[in-house]
Amino acid sequence: MTIENEALTLKKRFRGYFPVVVDVETAGFNAQTDALLEICAVTLRMDEEGVLHPASTIHFHIEPFEGANLEKEALEFNGIRDPFSPLRGAVSEQEALKEIYKLIRKEQKASDCSRAIMVAHNAAFDLSFVNAANERCKLKRVPFHPFATFDTATLSGLAYGQTVLAKACKTAGMEFDNREAHSALYDTQKTAELFCGIVNKWKALGGWPLVNEE
């Protein structure tokens, strides 16, 4: 691989990190006490031209952990009326996370990256719930960096002057259906599209590859 082609790889672009877009829906704001109810992850790939695209999607509804707090306002906000309904097809936190991590490790290895890094809108929130679930499930091999993230709320504020996901997407020229919002699946797909758009726009403006990098 030439130096020029190497600069257009996922590994080179993010310094060995493998970005994975994540969104969670929860039963409150406290990661230690409130239930994690839904999670989606979208992996990314970089084509031969150095353009970033969404790749694989994995999505789960999750059973509230034993003793979890369920805030009524949060359930009304995300539309999960009955977290215990069998119609949700929910699985345990452990099952969901293990399957997500299995996919991440496979694609991370294929990209020759050393570690996954979470991409999310207001990423500290999503990472806090994932980290809390990791602790509850006593998961030892977690692919994500424990605190580093790419936050699309911050990035879209810089790129488009908007920090709300729906407004950032619309300003970027993307379609956004507010009726679908607050579903982890839909929000993750839109966050992935937004992140790829920002990265690709920066490249198109001449910001990558770095001209002075040896």
Curated annotation (Swiss-Prot):
Q: Where is this site: Important for substrate binding and specificity?
A: 29, 77, 125, 147
One annotated GO biological process? tRNA processing
Q: How is the cofactor bound?
A: Binds two Mg(2+) per subunit. The active form of the enzyme binds two Mg(2+) ions in its active site. The first Mg(2+) forms only one salt bridge with the protein.
The GO terms this record gives for MF are: 3'-5' exonuclease activity; magnesium ion binding; nucleic acid binding; RNA exonuclease activity, producing 5'-phosphomonoesters
Task: Output the Gene Ontology cellular-component terms.
Answer: cytosol
The family database entries (CDD domains) matched by this protein are listed as: RNaseT (cd06134)
Requisite cofactors:
Mg(2+)
Residues that hold Mg(2+) 2 according to the record:
23, 25, 182, 187
Residues bound to Mg(2+) 1: 23
The record, for Gene3D superfamilies, names:
Ribonuclease H-like superfamily/Ribonuclease H
User: What's the EC number here?
Assistant: 3.1.13.-
Record's keyword terms, sorted: Exonuclease, Hydrolase, Magnesium, Metal-binding, Nuclease, tRNA processing
| Function of the molecule | Trims short 3' overhangs of a variety of RNA species, leaving a one or two nucleotide 3' overhang. Responsible for the end-turnover of tRNA: specifically removes the terminal AMP residue from uncharged tRNA (tRNA-C-C-A). Also appears to be involved in tRNA biosynthesis.
Q: How does it assemble?
A: Homodimer.
Q: Hey, which family's this protein in?
A: Belongs to the RNase T family.
In terms of PANTHER family, this protein maps to: DNA POLYMERASE III SUBUNIT EPSILON (PTHR30231), RIBONUCLEASE T (PTHR30231:SF2)
> What name goes with this protein?
Ribonuclease T
Record organism = Vibrio parahaemolyticus serotype O3:K6 (strain RIMD 2210633)
